Amino acid sequence: MELRIGFGFDSHEFVEGKLLILGGVEIEKDYGLKGHSDGDALLHAITDAILGALGERDIGEIFKDTDPRWKNAPSRIFLEKALEVMSEKGFNISNIDCVIVADRPKIAPHKERIKESLSKLLGIPKERISLKGKRREGFCEGNGLVCMCTVLLVKM
């Protein structure tokens, strides 16, 4: 058995008038995350964690923000590519542990929907997905959010 651990991080600034999407779930209609794609920072962090565990290039190198193909692209496309590479290398996801740091929106009311979405996207049971919402407690300016994710991959 071979185990690999990956860590992913992403942060985006809030912008008015854009849909906020986290983990493939529409959360807020009045403000979203600034980004070249749909700005789903949670899926970006998960994608980077998987790519990192596999020793691959990171999401920004593979899906450059200067490439018009990725303008407003759904972030699930990036995740699907990482999962494809993972599968080709013979790995499966054992579990993921994610943290969203933001003063707004509150994550708790959306937690189960996000976990259900991640379960479908990743092809693993919800019980193997940990999702936590944390507040910045006065640290930094609070005009965006940060997502971090650790993934454990296993090859039998």
UniProtKB/Swiss-Prot annotation:
Annotated positions binding 4-CDP-2-C-methyl-D-erythritol 2-phosphate: D10, S11, H12, H36, S37, D58, I59, G60, F63, K64, D65, T66, D67
Complex formation: Homotrimer.
Cofactor names: a divalent metal cation
Enzyme class, UniProt record, top EC level: lyase
Residues with site note (Transition state stabilizer): H36
Protein name: 2-C-methyl-D-erythritol 2,4-cyclodiphosphate synthase
PROSITE patterns: ISPF
Swiss-Prot/TrEMBL GO biological process terms: isopentenyl diphosphate biosynthetic process, methylerythritol 4-phosphate pathway; terpenoid biosynthetic process
Membrane-spanning residues: none
CDD domains reported in the protein's UniProt record: MECDP_synthase
E.C. number(s) listed in UniProt: 4.6.1.12
Pathway: Isoprenoid biosynthesis; isopentenyl diphosphate biosynthesis via DXP pathway; isopentenyl diphosphate from 1-deoxy-D-xylulose 5-phosphate: step 4/6
GO molecular function terms attached to this record: 2-C-methyl-D-erythritol 2,4-cyclodiphosphate synthase activity; metal ion binding
Organism the protein comes from: Aquifex aeolicus (strain VF5)
Residues reported to bind a divalent metal cation: D10, H12, H44
Keywords: Isoprene biosynthesis, Lyase, Metal-binding
Gene designation per UniProt: ispF
UniProt-listed Gene3D superfamilies: 2-C-methyl-D-erythritol 2,4-cyclodiphosphate synthase
SUPFAM superfamilies given in the database record: IpsF-like
Family, similarity comment: Belongs to the IspF family.
Pfam families registered for this protein in UniProt: YgbB
InterPro entries per the UniProt record, alphabetical: MECDP_synthase, MECDP_synthase_CS, MECDP_synthase_sf
